[in-house]
């Protein structure tokens, strides 16, 4: 393949900047779960876009933030690792917001890497033309970016231009992944993420940061798939919230997840959810690893 390009693009930014929304929009497929809760993404999720002259490998990193717990430090470590290994950094920001403390935290890290940095100014659908020009000028003063590309991941505005800019920073080389491959994460990981997404949408603020979802059993029964998952929280009170009055909350989560899992797997799904308390698990490195947030654990495919 003469002049073919392929490489890694780290998508970084503050929590809630729109990283996962952008990844899904670029791939035209749901690879990363989405929520309005900060730090929805925990693992570095690679989304792969292949066309006739370029293969883009996007790494959707956890939102970089000042950590309060061991889990937060692990999330930052995951993001930093992606930045160090990539060919170009795509720093996504909410174009309607000013440069803040969280951005300073990211900038300090970027400055040590000496990598090309493309500023992705997201959520421009919220801005008028004059506002957009002012925000572009404002961000140009914050850092010597290699490029600045205004987009709206939500309405898929200017994404082709963003791909064109990224391509300019990728090295020539053969595709690293098969053309049909959209993610380097297996189906087990993605199934657990769907359940976690439903929990994020339905529970109170204290639950999202405290929850991990583990696939414990997967079994094909005729034309149906049986799945058993364990939902882990770190306090008894959170277990009560997750289960709900007369098990109403866990039932609602199960039914919503079951519907999406059916669409993903192409067959009927029987999903069982159990809730377990692991006190203060977010501060124990061995538990973080056990739950697949530092290194993904996998269940063998049947």
Language-model segment annotations:
Residues 18, 158, 249:
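Conserved glycine(s) of the Walker
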Residues 29, 48-52, 67, 82, ...:
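Conserved, well-folded catalytic cores of nucleic-acid-processing
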Residues 41, 64-66, 99, 127-128, ...:
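Catalytic P-loop NTPase motifs of RecA-like helicase/translocase cores
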Residues 116, 125-183:
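Canonical P-loop GTPase G-domain recognition
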Residues 187-302:
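P-loop NTP-binding site
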């Amino acid at each position: 393949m003469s002049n073919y390009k392929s490489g890694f693009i780290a998508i970084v930014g503050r929590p809630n900047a729109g990283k996962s929304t952008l990844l899904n929009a670029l791939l035209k497929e749901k690879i990363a779960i989405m929520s309005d809760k900060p730090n929805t993404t925990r693992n570095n999720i690679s989304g792969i876009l292949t066309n006739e002259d370029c293969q883009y490998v996007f790494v959707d990193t956890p939102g970089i933030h000042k950590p309060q717990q061991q889990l937060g430090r692990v999330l930052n470590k995951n993001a930093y690792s992606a930045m160090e290994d990539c060919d170009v950094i795509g720093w996504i920001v909410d174009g309607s917001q000013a440069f803040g403390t969280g951005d300073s935290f990211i900038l300090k890290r970027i400055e040590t890497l000496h990598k090309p940095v493309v500023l992705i100014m997201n959520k421009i659908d919220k801005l008028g033309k004059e506002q957009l020009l002012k925000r572009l000028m404002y961000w140009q003063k914050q850092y010597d970016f290699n490029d600045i590309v205004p987009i709206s991941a939500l309405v898929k505005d200017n994404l082709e231009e963003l791909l064109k800019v990224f391509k300019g920073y990728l090295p020539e080389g053969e595709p690293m992944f098969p053309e049909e491959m959209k993610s380097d994460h297996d189906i087990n990981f993605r199934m657990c993420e769907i359940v976690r997404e439903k929990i994020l949408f339905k529970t109170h603020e204290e639950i999202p940061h405290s929850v991990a979802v583990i696939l414990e059993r997967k079994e094909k029964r005729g034309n149906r798939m049986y799945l058993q998952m364990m939902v882990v929280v770190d306090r008894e009170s959170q277990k009560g919230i997750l289960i709900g009055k007369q098990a109403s909350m866990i039932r609602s989560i199960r039914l919503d997840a079951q519907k999406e899992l059916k669409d993903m797997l192409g067959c009927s799904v029987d999903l069982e959810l159990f809730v377990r308390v692991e006190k203060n698990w977010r501060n124990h490195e061995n538990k973080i690893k056990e739950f697949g947030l530092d290194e993904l654990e996998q269940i063998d495919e049947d």
